Amino acid sequence: MVKAAAKSRKSRILIADDNAPNVELLEAFLTDVECEIAVAVDGRDTLEKVTAFKPDLILLDVMMPKMSGFEVCRKLKQDAATKDIMILMVTALNELGDIERAVEAGTDGFLSKPVNKLDMLKHIEVMLRLRHVTDELERLRRYIQEMEDGSGPEGDGPKEPKK
């Protein structure tokens, strides 16, 4: 079973695929993952759901109406507010050129359909762990910066290192 690294809330996974049977299969694969799931049915819907749902990870199909997965990925990775969302492209496209386009767009991972359940779950586990560790590292970095600036909980200025 894949468990989210963060204890404060369940991980959020957005499935972005316009094919209902594919969505159902991915949802079935995720039944043992402790997560909240949302579904987007096209590229524009994906961008809207990202804003509202704030996913930790997106399972992103490439060939969707209104905007391709490549374009969605590129937009998300170029935006400071969404660049840290993990993106796993799940697609029937599996030529070397397709993988290169996915990497150029900024994807964090790539799986070809038909998807192997264990392979997908391992990718998700690693990506969620990385996302949560990165979030915790950023939280600690901000805390240290506040302490150094004297704006932390003690509020008495920067500390001199002990000798």
What does each of the following model-derived ranges do?
Residues 64, 87:
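Receiver (REC) domain active-site loop signature in two-component systems and cognate sites
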Residues 20-41:
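Two-component/phosphorelay signaling modules centered on CheY-like receiver
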